[in-house]
Amino acid sequence: MQVSVETTQGLERRLTISVPAEQIEKLVNESLKREAKRARIPGFRPGKVPMSVVSKRYGAAIRQDVTGEIMQRNFVEAIIAEKLNPAGAPTFMPGASDADKFEFVATFEVYPEVELKGLDAIEVEQPKADVTDADVDSMIETLRKQHATFDAAPRAAEEGDKVVINFVGSVDGEEFQGGKAEGFELQLGSGRMIPGFEEGIKGHKAGEEFEIDVTFPEEYHAENLKGKAAKFAITLTEVKAANLPEVNDEFAKLFGITDGGVEALKAEIRKNMSRELEQALKANVKEQVINGLLAANDIELPKALIDGEINVLRRQAVQRFGGNAANMPELPAELFAEQAERRVKVGLLLGEVIKSTELKVEEERVQALIASMASAYEDPAEVIEYYNGNKELMQNMRNVALEEQAVEALLKSAKVTEKEVAFEEFMNKATGRA
């Protein structure tokens, strides 16, 4: 086998491989002989079909199969000999073959050589937060509001009330599509409507008719309404005030707490909030570390890996919307290109961190991750057993653990400053509510 390597552009490589033609002919003849023994052709006894007949009927297909096998086998031997690391499947094209040699060209991309830099320049503001008694009380108040009942109130509407309204919206005196409703129920303070709408209802009583002036946000989804001033004619038909449940043993039972009453409920709430806080703190630091790593290391990305990641994201998008990929038009690659490129780049860089620091997955960490995730379920032991019995899920958790270890390794060389933050403020930002 003779091999020549050519760098065409970027990460693309072209291997020209030639092997003795007799290798092809030998394998073709062996395959034809095997086919002759089992061929069933009218006019000939089994095993007695002349080779010329077998060759005429099956020769082209057999030669194609043999050629494919020869190319694949010699390609693997060539990349091992040349110490190349393909980042995707090759494409094979025939070369300048003759009676003495069979030549083909394999074109493919290789993984980039990653040399990490700027790790000591990564800046991380590490948030520090705790779940306080006030945070637990605030969560209980939220739960009370979620389980409130509503009764008609003979007073003016205020924050937290539910109102039932009829409304008609207009821009420049013209009604617009989607701007009209009857019997529409709205909780004041929910933020469901555009700015100023809910505020304009406060202070009015059932039976009143009035108008409010608002402006649609510039980022509003309807193109024809972005930034437009609008007027809404409103009829307020009902005002319903919230009745919050008392915090007692019966309230605790609503959340599955049958023993220990309110104190047990508070303990359970604190445990859940602490778990969510820990996850959010980790995610915040990880994002900062990854962003710093990406900013300091610009590497060329194999198109094959990006295309593969786009396909994964495309399938996930279809699944999220409950669709069947076979029955849906293919979502354009542009929708996922930026995210795919980031994921590929992060994967390559973290892979180099793991390699250069010789990290090995910590099984104790894997089990801790599974236990933390399982604690959110009704029967944690059952979830833990299920994960430990599923090879694919366990491999996923090992990957998560190893990625955590890589981030921690990067954190050791980063410039880290700590910042005390309040639970509510931090969690609101983490969940996009701020």
Swiss-Prot record:
Alphabetic keyword roster: Cell cycle, Cell division, Chaperone, Cytoplasm, Isomerase, Rotamase
Function: Involved in protein export. Acts as a chaperone by maintaining the newly synthesized protein in an open conformation. Functions as a peptidyl-prolyl cis-trans isomerase.
Location relative to the cell: Cytoplasm
One Gene Ontology CC term in the entry: cytoplasm
Keyword Ribosomal protein: no
PPIase FKBP-type domain span: 160-245
Residue spans crossing the bilayer: none
Record-linked NCBIfam families: tig
A GO biological process held by the record: 'de novo' cotranslational protein folding
Reaction(s) this enzyme catalyzes, per UniProt: [protein]-peptidylproline (omega=180) = [protein]-peptidylproline (omega=0)
EC numbers on record: 5.2.1.8
GO molecular function: peptidyl-prolyl cis-trans isomerase activity; protein folding chaperone; ribosome binding
Family statement: Belongs to the FKBP-type PPIase family. Tig subfamily.
Domain notes: Consists of 3 domains; the N-terminus binds the ribosome, the middle domain has PPIase activity, while the C-terminus has intrinsic chaperone activity on its own.
Gene: tig
Pfam families, per the entry: FKBP_C (PF00254), Trigger_C (PF05698), Trigger_N (PF05697)
SUPFAM superfamilies, sorted: FKBP-like (SSF54534), Triger factor/SurA peptide-binding domain-like (SSF109998), Trigger factor ribosome-binding domain (SSF102735)
InterPro entries linked to this entry: PPIase_dom_sf, PPIase_FKBP_dom, Trig_fac, Trigger_fac_C, Trigger_fac_C_sf, Trigger_fac_ribosome-bd_bac, Trigger_fac_ribosome-bd_sf, Trigger_fact/SurA_dom_sf
Keyword Cell wall biogenesis/degradation attributed: no
Record protein name field: Trigger factor
